[in-house]
Amino acid sequence: MPTSFVSALAQVRPDDYESAIGAAHRRFGWTAVIIMGVVGLWGLVLAVMRREPGRYYAVGATVASIALLVQVGMGLWVYVNDDAEWAGNQHVFYGIVILFTFSFAYIYRSKLAQRAALSYGLLGLFLMGLGIRGIQNFGQSFGG
């Protein structure tokens, strides 16, 4: 039986070393990455079919973007407020790269809109890849 996001969030139990926000960040990281990947693939399918993204795609892209930005926000909050050095600076680095990617997508939004399905599909897959790298590098740091 599927559970709602709110009931799933209520089940999050933090460990001794992290806050509830940290536990939510850890638990829902893959959810945000998968949603972004699905929307990215959806955009590529639309591009191959030579169709413009419609309202449903815009809603999906918005949900995926919000999910990923909430993840980054929770991660930064945990890093600043919980002194989460255990996360490793590579994990934090990829969160910051995700923020920069969203910033550049906003700056170049008029250029991206010229071939919207292809551009936003590739952007979604790129962001998914950054999220995967961030998860894979959890606990690792640059240098020694």
Predicted regions: what they are:
Residues 49-68, 89-90:
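Loop-to-helix transition at the N-terminal end of transmembrane alpha-helices
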Residues 64-78:
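A generic, lipid-embedded transmembrane alpha helix
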Residues 27-34, 84-97:
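Structural signature of hydrophobic alpha-helical transmembrane segments
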Residues 129-144:
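Juxtamembrane boundary at the C-terminal end of a transmembrane helix
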Residues 56-64, 115-124:
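Cytoplasmic-side transmembrane-helix entry/capping segments in multi-pass membrane proteins
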Residues 33-49:
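N-terminal signal-anchor/start-transfer transmembrane helix
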Residues 83-86, 103-120, 136:
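Membrane-helix boundary connector in multi-pass membrane proteins
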Residues 1-24, 141-144:
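Short, strongly hydrophobic alpha-helical membrane anchors
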